């Protein structure tokens, strides 16, 4: 039995903290306390709940630099990214607070009376956050769930619990009821399973691998428990010949090197029309070489380390040592470093071209025409994100509709905004997070008919 988890700085391998591991018994106690706090929270006037969430957002803003530095230390994120993530949490809390007083039902015309619907909170929601974006993704589940009147039990990843613990402290300082937002550090096998299987938890929100997501889905099925799953990805970056090839090549590296490639939206399959394939690669070489890899606390750094030695070994295993391609540089010495890598001459069905590597690795594959591009783009089990580079508006719309993925960008690699929906097709998940309907995903619809005929 693991009683505590060691948090390491992935850039230095130094011990940052040891955090007690939550037991199954402690999860059960937390659920009971959360249920009581949720009743108090749901009974508050909507304006009061919104005010407290806005206060929470203000405190996150005041502590943004400390949160960002924690994210750098425990997750290896670059300082620029970590600052964006802290701001994203602040903005999402504000956005969710704005929805509290707008979470309305409907009046539906019926004969013989009045029919109305109510959106009621589920109760206690379990949020299982990943290690790749521990701070913002924790808020993606927690903020709308709280805004809809629920309590939240957040289980962070074993390697990255520190920002979650700080968020819970800020929630208390903001005046949210005690036990309404609790953080339960621990292993997936113990704390995670206890959260998923507890009958008092009405919904589970999980972000992580497709393999673990399937296990959670099976456990939720035993109790017909609601769930949202944001899982893996192997997203395409489709470059047509009519686009500015130099601009497309310059934009490509950070579409898969952001967070050292540990991003489910990473555009790790670069599909380039054959007529411009060689020219694209010529421009891609200097673009990859120019990416600054190093100390994530340095404001000039664009890419930091992988999260752990285990992740480093997984990436090494999936990347063929003798493959042709483009390789950037990475620091030697301590830390979990892997250089930016672009592979060419890879078969479209090779593991590195179809499986989620979750590292700074992409493959470049040629395609002939629009139909061939769509076929290649859809030739994985995933469907989370993708980019389409073209000057032809008609083609952009046709390909956007034909690619089986939930989040597509044209002439851009943007995938996540807190005010637009986010989620995947196929093996990339179930449900949507963020956006204008985020709060409704944490409610039940109740229909009430009131007869008016004597």
Can you name each region flagged by the protein language model?
Residues 2-5, 267, 384:
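Short loop/turn microsegments at loop-to-beta-strand junctions
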């Amino acid at each position: 039995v693991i009683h505590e988890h060691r948090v390491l700085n992935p850039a230095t391998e130094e011990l940052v903290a040891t955090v007690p591991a939550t037991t199954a018994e402690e999860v059960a106690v937390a659920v009971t306390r959360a249920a009581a706090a949720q009743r108090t929270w749901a009974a508050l006037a909507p304006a009061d709940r919104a005010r407290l969430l806005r206060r929470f957002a203000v405190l996150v803003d005041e502590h943004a630099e400390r949160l960002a530095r924690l994210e750098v230390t425990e997750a290896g994120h670059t300082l620029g990214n970590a600052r964006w993530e802290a701001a994203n949490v602040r903005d999402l809390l504000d956005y969710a607070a704005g929805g509290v007083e707008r979470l309305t039902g409907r009046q539906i015309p019926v004969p013989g009376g009045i029919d109305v619907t109510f959106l009621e909170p589920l109760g206690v929601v379990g949020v299982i956050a990943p290690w790749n974006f521990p701070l913002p993704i924790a808020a993606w589940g927690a903020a709308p769930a709280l805004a809809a009147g629920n309590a939240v039990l957040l289980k962070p990843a074993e390697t990255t619990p520190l920002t979650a613990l700080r968020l819970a402290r800020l929630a208390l300082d903001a005046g949210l009821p005690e036990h309404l937002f609790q953080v339960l550090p621990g292993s997936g096998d113990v704390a995670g399973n206890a959260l998923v299987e507890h009958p008092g938890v009405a919904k589970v929100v999980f972000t992580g691998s497709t393999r673990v997501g399937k296990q959670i889905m099976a456990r939720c099925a035993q109790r017909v428990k609601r769930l949202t799953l944001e899982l893996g990805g192997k997203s395409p970056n489709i470059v047509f010949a009519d686009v500015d090839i130099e601009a497309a090549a310059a934009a490509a590296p950070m579409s898969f090197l952001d967070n050292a490639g540990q991003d489910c939206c990473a555009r790790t399959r670069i599909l380039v029309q054959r007529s411009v394939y060689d020219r694209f690669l010529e421009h891609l070489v200097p673009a990859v070489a120019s990416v600054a890899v190093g100390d994530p606390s340095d404001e000039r750094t664009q890419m930091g380390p992988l999260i752990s030695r285990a992740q480093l070994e997984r990436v090494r295993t999936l990347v063929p040592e003798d493959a042709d391609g483009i390789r950037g540089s990475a620091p030697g010495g301590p830390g979990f470093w892997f250089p930016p890598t672009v592979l060419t001459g890879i078969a479209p069905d090779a593991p590195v071209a179809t499986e989620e590597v979750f590292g700074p690795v992409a493959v470049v594959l040629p395609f002939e025409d629009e139909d061939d591009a769509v076929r290649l783009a859809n030739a994985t089990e995933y469907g989370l994100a993708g980019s389409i580079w073209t000057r032809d508006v008609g083609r952009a719309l046709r390909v956007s509709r034909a690619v089986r993925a939930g989040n597509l960008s044209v002439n851009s690699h943007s995938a996540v905004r807190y005010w637009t929906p986010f989620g995947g097709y196929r093996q990339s998940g179930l449900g949507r997070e963020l956006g204008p309907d985020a709060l409704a995903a944490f409610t039940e619809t109740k229909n009430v008919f009131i007869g008016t005929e004597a």
